[in-house]
Curated annotation (Swiss-Prot):
The gene is rpsC. Keywords: Ribonucleoprotein, Ribosomal protein, RNA-binding, rRNA-binding. GO terms for cellular component: cytosolic small ribosomal subunit. Transmembrane segments: none annotated. Signal peptide: none annotated. It comes from Hydrogenovibrio crunogenus (strain DSM 25203 / XCL-2) (Thiomicrospira crunogena). This is Small ribosomal subunit protein uS3. The lineage of its organism: Bacteria, Pseudomonadati, Pseudomonadota, Gammaproteobacteria, Thiotrichales. The keyword Ribonucleoprotein applies. Pfam families: KH_2, Ribosomal_S3_C. Residues 39-107 form the KH type-2 domain. Belongs to the universal ribosomal protein uS3 family. Part of the 30S ribosomal subunit. Forms a tight complex with proteins S10 and S14.
């Protein structure tokens, strides 16, 4: 039976970048990894309602640089920067190292898979019909420039006794094309009937143009050297 690979994991180094960027020897690797997990856990707990999509962690010299990608930067920063300062102090206490926090605003949350999945889950928790929630998310994404989107929900849909999965797709989502820029995320909705899983794939276009332009330039330069 064929198994499905993670759409982001297979594209790391091609169209996607790593969420954590640092180097460590074998002695410090496990400590850094556990520290990263604790930082993400702390931020996700304190920023539940801030529409956080991604947390990037970089380790430089003797400090940690954390970049938070959010659709609501004002909620993260707080009044006169009070909330972000509290976050910074909490992370310094947890890691024991200087921490620098940067905020990156997500201009189009309708094209972010994590935020779309979270939005659908919140609607399901409010007892909105799953088909309506799915179609609304799909139409918003396509209206704002997505080339394709697929949404999958699974569980006791509408309180049915037997769990099932249903999906809705518009446009194209080429999962086997590595140059395709596909955003993928999952989220869980806690309903009175149990958990409902939400998966979202968003295809934003292909990222081959820049790579091909560089390779063409290299070919031309090699050709000129050969003529000499």
């Amino acid at each position: 039976m064929g198994q499905k690979v993670h759409p982001i994991g297979i594209r790391l180094g091609i169209t996607k970048d790593w969420n954590a960027r640092w180097y460590a020897d074998s002695k410090n690797y496990s400590d850094f990894l556990i520290s990263d997990i604790e930082i993400r856990k702390e931020l996700n707990e304190k920023l539940k309602h801030a529409s956080v999509s991604q947390i990037n962690i970089e380790r430089v010299a003797n400090g940690v640089r954390v970049t938070i990608h959010t659709a609501r930067p004002g909620v993260v920063i707080g009044k006169k920067g009070e909330d972000i300062e509290k976050l910074k102090q909490a992370l310094i206490a947890k890691t024991g190292m200087p921490v620098n926090i940067n905020i990156e605003e997500i201009k189009k949350p309708e094209l972010d898979a994590k935020l779309v999945a979270e939005g659908i889950a919140q609607q399901l928790e409010k007892r909105i019909q799953f088909r309506r929630a799915m179609k609304r998310a799909v139409s918003n994404a396509m209206r704002l420039g997505a080339q394709g989107i697929k949404v999958n929900v699974s569980g006791r849909l509408n309180g049915a006794e037997i769990a099932r999965a249903e999906w809705y797709r518009e446009g194209r989502v080429p999962l086997h094309t590595l140059r395709a820029d596909i955003d993928y995320a999952t989220f869980e909705a806690d309903t009175t009937y149990g958990k409902i899983g939400v998966k979202v794939w968003i295809f934003k276009g292909e990222k081959l143009e820049k790579i091909s332009m560089v390779s063409d330039d290299k070919k031309q330069s090699k050709g000129k050297k050969g003529r000499k």
